[in-house]
């Protein structure tokens, strides 16, 4: 859930609680002491959120409920949902407008622009199926009201599960206002298989490339460049086609990474020239003006200002 939790953290909540299944020891270890709750039985989304009650405690702020398998959600969208509740809505729901809404639940509006109900596609009337606004599944609710409504929902449905979306009907019955915030369709894309994973990776890579170019980095064929999310590339750097910049890299101002180079854990000063066909492995440090040429591999090596390794070389555990 790293991408989702990173977005939540950037949105500024006081606490992030992850709801897990009982057989989630690996994820619990990965959380490294961060709060989590266990949903003992898989009894629906409402039951999953209710499982966090004891961990959340008496918090009287705003709860944002999101899915760990939607890595493309942004902090700005989560903030917009929280702001909607802070402005007076009892519940704020993320909505999106896909090119083809078939199969998605619809957010049925009322006359005042609020949400009257959520209806699944299979249960929708022909008129409701013409509604473009679909349920993104992410919502913000004031915490005390959230758990009060969850205590009132039932599992009287075909699946015998407790649905989080049932709190909308309860809120409206209590005379409360339910609003929506429109977000991009890609933000609610779930990752359920390897095909979804590839699509999500492509979308995230596009975001990383755009951010780098907006920061002053030149990419001559950006669709062929692959970046780690933690890579730092300073302005006026030039990245040629078919380059991989992996985890832990820092590329200095004005440096050039030429085609078919692969970097991981490397730190480059300003105006370095890397590649083509160079491989920089973890522990590589290059000061200003270093040249590492074609078919050169480095690991745990420091190259001082102006040093050159032009071609066909392995440098390991060295200082040049």
What are these regions (language model features)?
Residues 13, 60, 87-91, 176:
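Short, high-confidence coil segments that cap the C-terminus of an alpha-helix
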Residues 25, 29, 73-158, 165:
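Conserved core of the sugar-phosphate nucleotidyltransferase
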Residues 1-83:
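Conserved N-terminal catalytic core of the sugar/cofactor nucleotidyltransferase
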Residues 7, 15, 30, 53-54, ...:
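Catalytic cores of nucleotide-enabled group-transfer and carboxylate-activating enzymes in metabolic
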Residues 15, 35, 114, 177-179, ...:
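Conserved beta-strand segments of alpha/beta enzyme cores
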Residues 156-320:
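Left-handed beta-helix
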């Amino acid at each position: 859930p790293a991408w989702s939790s990173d977005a939540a953290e950037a949105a500024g909540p006081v606490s992030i609680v992850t709801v897990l299944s009982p057989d989630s020891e690996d994820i619990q270890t990965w959380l490294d002491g961060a709060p989590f709750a266990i949903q003992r039985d898989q009894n629906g989304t409402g039951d999953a959120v209710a499982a966090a009650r004891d961990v959340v405690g008496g918090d009287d702020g705003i709860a944002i409920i999101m899915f760990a398998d939607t890595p493309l959600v942004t902090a700005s969208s989560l903030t917009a949902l929280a702001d909607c509740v802070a402005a007076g809505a009892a519940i704020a729901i993320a909505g999106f407008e896909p090119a083809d809404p078939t199969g998605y639940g619809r957010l049925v509006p009322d006359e005042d622009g609020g949400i009257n109900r959520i209806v699944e596609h299979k249960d929708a009337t022909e008129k409701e199926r013409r509604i473009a606004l679909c349920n993104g599944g992410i919502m913000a609710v004031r915490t005390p009201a959230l758990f009060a409504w969850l205590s009132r929902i039932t599992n009287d449905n075909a699946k015998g599960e407790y649905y989080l979306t049932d709190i909308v009907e309860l809120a409206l019955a209590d005379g409360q206002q339910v609003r929506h915030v429109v977000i991009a369709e890609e933000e609610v894309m779930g990752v359920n298989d390897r095909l979804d994973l590839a699509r999500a990776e492509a979308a995230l890579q596009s975001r990383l490339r755009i951010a780098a170019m907006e920061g002053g980095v030149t990419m001559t064929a950006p669709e062929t460049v692959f970046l780690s999310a933690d890579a730092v590339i300073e302005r006026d750097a030039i990245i040629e086609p078919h380059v991989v910049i992996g985890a832990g890299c820092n590329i200095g101002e004005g440096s050039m990474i030429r085609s078919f180079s692969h970097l991981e854990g490397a730190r480059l000063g300003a105006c370095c020239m890397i590649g083509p066909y160079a491989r920089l492995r973890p522990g590589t440090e290059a000061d200003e003006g270093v040249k590492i040429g074609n078919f050169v591999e480095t690991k745990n090596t420091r190259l001082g200002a102006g040093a050159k390794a032009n071609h066909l070389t392995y440098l390991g555990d060295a200082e040049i």
